[in-house]
Amino acid sequence: MWQLWASLCCLLVLANARSRPSFHPLSDELVNYVNKRNTTWQAGHNFYNVDMSYLKRLCGTFLGGPKPPQRVMFTEDLKLPASFDAREQWPQCPTIKEIRDQGSCGSCWAFGAVEAISDRICIHTNAHVSVEVSAEDLLTCCGSMCGDGCNGGYPAEAWNFWTRKGLVSGGLYESHVGCRPYSIPPCEHHVNGSRPPCTGEGDTPKCSKICEPGYSPTYKQDKHYGYNSYSVSNSEKDIMAEIYKNGPVEGAFSVYSDFLLYKSGVYQHVTGEMMGGHAIRILGWGVENGTPYWLVANSWNTDWGDNGFFKILRGQDHCGIESEVVAGIPRTDQYWEKI
């Protein structure tokens, strides 16, 4: 009897596998399949002529890693709006609107952290301090505690590094903004563009505790520190309250190949292979055509998605988006003379 049962189970598994369509991650067929499903989002081409190794390396977050203690939230009496956009709530903080580019490096774990940290420094100093915190400094100097540099890392450890060691300033590639701007160039997602090709190769840059020529103060003097770091529970309301009170947070989720094709709407996984874990910055929420969403900033340049941003289903821990949220509070005492 058990042999018959085992045979039936095998047949069901095979039938289910065959019923799932299989597409190349960047194919017209996958775009058409998603769009014909009449789901809550629209697919289109964001990448052309790029290596699969590059696409998988974009997803450089190790999910399920160590987490700092949760911060106790008191949200019972907090009245949260139906929609919220940190760009509109704190318009005097320019980094909230910014989209960065991680290039050919699995550094999303570092970008999600420094983007949210930059936003929070501005928010918690009432816009008296506006700084682009350096992804380069975090990526190169956190070492094995944070993971493996361009080969992936842990978002929670990025925030811990900020509180323990501090992070210097640093803008985009060749921006010459701050102490340590990003040293990895953006790569070309399109066929006839001017940027270098996207590959899945490249070593993590070396940690340098010297600011670029012409910048002052010194590396040590330029450090920005966190007062604390913590994880946020996977409660939808707790995450909303954290963003509402303190600013954008870092989150992470499982990326499937259909996500690479996101153009607009509220993303929900339809089909496609698992690419890896990916860290991002969550800056708000809302409802679109009856579908609740998180508003999220990616780090794949402004020519990806909706000018670099995307929306993803909210309230159902879709692809794990609500399970890996981390944040922290800046040490504002270091800015007293500016405030």
From Swiss-Prot:
Alphabetical list of Gene3D superfamilies matching this protein: Cysteine proteinases
Location(s), subcellular: Lysosome; Melanosome; Secreted, Extracellular space; Apical cell membrane
Tissues with expression: Expressed in the stratum spinosum of the epidermis. Weak expression is detected in the stratum granulosum.
Disulfide bonds: C93-C122, C105-C150, C141-C207, C142-C146, C179-C211, C187-C198
Residues with attached carbohydrate: N192
InterPro entries tied to this protein: Papain-like_cys_pep_sf, Pept_asp_AS, Pept_cys_AS, Pept_his_AS, Peptidase_C1A, Peptidase_C1A_C, Propeptide_C1A
The EC number(s) this enzyme carries: 3.4.22.1
Residues the record marks as active site: C108, H278, N298
GO-annotated cellular components: apical plasma membrane; collagen-containing extracellular matrix; endolysosome lumen; external side of plasma membrane; extracellular exosome; extracellular region; extracellular space; ficolin-1-rich granule lumen
Protein's membrane topology: Peripheral membrane protein
SMART domains: Pept_C1
Signal peptide stretch: 1-17
Catalytic activity annotation: Hydrolysis of proteins with broad specificity for peptide bonds. Preferentially cleaves -Arg-Arg-|-Xaa bonds in small molecule substrates (thus differing from cathepsin L). In addition to being an endopeptidase, shows peptidyl-dipeptidase activity, liberating C-terminal dipeptides
Clinical note on disease: Keratolytic winter erythema: An autosomal dominant genodermatosis characterized by recurrent episodes of palmoplantar erythema and epidermal peeling presenting seasonal variation. KWE manifests during childhood. Skin lesions may spread to the dorsum of hands and feet and to the interdigital spaces. Lower legs, knees and thighs may also be involved. A less common finding is a slowly migratory, annular erythema that is seen mostly on the extremities. Between flares, the skin can appear unremarkable. Itching can occur, and hyperhidrosis, associated with a pungent odor, is invariably present.
Family: Belongs to the peptidase C1 family.
Subunit field text: Dimer of a heavy chain and a light chain cross-linked by a disulfide bond. Interacts with SRPX2. Directly interacts with SHKBP1.
Role summary: Thiol protease which is believed to participate in intracellular degradation and turnover of proteins. Cleaves matrix extracellular phosphoglycoprotein MEPE. Involved in the solubilization of cross-linked TG/thyroglobulin in the thyroid follicle lumen. Has also been implicated in tumor invasion and metastasis.
Name of protein: Cathepsin B
Underlying gene: CTSB
